[in-house]
Amino acid sequence: FRGLGMDMELLAWLNTNTFPEEARYRDLKYAKEAYRIFAQDMKKSATTRACVFATRHVDSTLLLMNLMEKTGLKTMIGKVNMDRNAPDYLIESSVQEALDETKDWLKKTHGKFNNVTPILTPRFTPACSDDLMKELGALREKYELPVQSHLSENRDEVAWVKELCPWSAFYGETYDKYGLFGGRNQNTVMAHCVYSGEAEQRLMKENGVFIAHCPESNTNLASGIAPVRKYLDDGQKVGLGSDVAGGSTESLFKAMVSAILVSKLRWRLADESLKPLTVPEAFYMGTKGGGAFFGKVGSFEPGYEMDALIVDDSFLAWPKERNLRDRLERVIYLSDRCELRAKYTA
């Protein structure tokens, strides 16, 4: 359902588009066809590794994991948890149901995959009660699982979290209280971080939380522009995300371009102290920056795993010979006119 409902903001889009679509995945026939398309698109894309949200349904999540295993890509896939503020047709009816289904899913994935890893996935704080967060934190600690979720994406969402969790000083604390926000050698990635304040940023850095910058999604849903220049300058861990279906494409090349474009708008219109991103910085976020969530990935340096693309840029012919840096920039900006000849994932 990419490319639909792009005239709405986040919360309206979730209720109008996302939740009704996700409910269809309880039908395995529908899920198989939809996930087959997704797996094929991912295999054809420039992506070698990804974190993926499935739905709350155990069987369809396992189906997606099986399909992604066959692509050869390295992925972390999560069964979504949500026990409040969701439609009756999609919500997990109790903390116990959510916990039982999540344990069942983890049991069924144990030792089954070479390329796919389970990742705990509380949808976001508005959809997960404190009791559920507490139980998921215990699961994370017991099984040493990575975590993915959303953080400070939309102004209305941030205000809603404050209403739901008045005890929290900021959004990130609603995860951190239950051990779901990095720290203790835990791998956590939070999408968006558009409105993360200074205290939240300090905790992210202290706990080693990864930021998945999703510029196209943040633009499509009118969420805002994350201060990525500040994150990079402060030494935060930052990678790029497509956030489909909030984003309309899985292309990381387009994510790189979007990241540069929105940083220029933020610099010009909102804060001239935060200089725009450069092409090398955007490329770093799409390779080594995001790859670090998976280990030593995203570079050709000694000791790194061999993830690589062979890209044919001969379609970008020009009378003047180009150096390697210029060729890379053109591939990033004109990726639709290039051809991906091969892809390798360690």
Q: Language model features by range: what are they?
A:
Residues 59-194, 199:
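Metal-coordinating catalytic core of metallo-dependent amide/deamination hydrolases
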Residues 305-346:
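C-terminal cap of metal-dependent C-N hydrolases
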Residues 180-316:
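Active-site-adjacent C-terminal substructures of enzyme catalytic domains
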Residues 2-31, 79, 84-96, 154-185, ...:
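Active-site gating loops and adjacent loop-to-helix segments of metal-dependent hydrolytic enzymes
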Residues 2-73, 98-112:
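Alpha-helical scaffold segments that flank or form the walls of functional sites
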Residues 50-52, 147, 239, 309:
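Hydrophobic residues within beta-strands of alpha/beta enzymes
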